[in-house]
A protein has these predicted regions:
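Short beta-edge strand/loop motif at the mouth of beta-sheet-based domains
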Residues: 20-21, 40-80
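Hydrophobic ligand-binding cavity/cleft-lining segments
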Residues: 1-53
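Intrinsic-disorder/low-complexity, polar/charged segments enriched in Ser/Thr/Lys/Arg/Asp/Glu/Gln
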Residues: 16-22, 29-31, 68, 82, ...
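Hydrophobic/aromatic beta-strand elements that line small-molecule binding cavities or substrate pockets
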Residues: 23, 58-59, 83-88, 100-101, ...
C-alpha cells in the first residue's frame, strides 16, 4: 500500500507546472556563475530594489552538492522573506541545480536548474523551474524570475 501512495505522489510531483526562461547576457559564463554562487555578488542583483528595504538582503551559500543556501530580505512594507534549499548538482560555470522553497511554505519545494552556455562574448542562460505547486505559483515565479534576471543582466553587463 505504501508503494501505491509513493507512486501516486511521485506521479503528481513530476506532473506539476514548470517554467523555462532563456536570456542572453553580455557577460562570460564564469561571471554569471559567480553571480549565482558568491554571496557578495548574489546580494548585488537578487531582489527588485523598489520592493526591498535597503540593506536587508542577505545571502549564504555552502557551494557543494548537499550544501545549503539561503537568501533573506525585508520588503518595504516590513514583511520578511526567506528562500533556500540544497545544491543537487554543481558544474562550475555551466550548471547549477538546487531545491527551492520559501520558508513560509516548505511543503511546496520545487527545483531550479540554471544552465550557462557560451554565446560569442556573452552567455545563454536557461532557467528551468520545475515541480511548482500549482499554476498560480508558476505564474508568480515567472514574473519574479523575469524581474530578477533583468537585475542579473544589469549587474553582470
Amino acid at each position: 500500500m505504501a508503494s501505491q501512495s509513493s507512486t501516486a505522489r511521485d506521479a503528481d510531483f513530476t506532473t506539476r507546472p514548470s517554467l523555462t526562461i532563456k536570456r542572453r547576457i553580455n557577460a562570460a559564463p564564469a561571471k554569471i556563475y559567480a553571480a549565482w554562487t558568491d554571496p557578495e555578488k548574489l546580494i548585488g542583483w537578487f531582489g527588485v530594489p523598489a520592493k526591498l528595504k535597503q540593506g536587508t538582503l542577505q545571502a549564504e551559500t555552502d557551494l557543494c552538492v548537499g550544501g545549503r543556501y539561503s537568501i533573506s530580505f525585508e520588503a518595504v512594507d516590513g514583511e520578511h522573506f526567506r528562500v533556500g534549499g540544497v545544491y543537487r548538482e554543481i558544474v562550475p560555470n555551466e550548471r547549477l541545480v538546487f531545491s527551492w522553497a520559501w520558508h513560509s511554505t516548505p511543503e511546496r519545494e520545487s527545483q531550479v536548474t540554471i544552465s550557462l552556455k557560451p554565446d560569442g562574448t556573452g552567455t545563454l542562460l536557461t532557467l528551468h523551474h520545475e515541480q511548482l505547486f500549482n499554476e498560480a505559483a508558476r505564474d508568480g515565479h515567472a514574473k519574479g524570475w523575469n524581474a530578477l534576471l533583468d537585475q542579473l543582466e544589469a549587474f553582470a553587463s
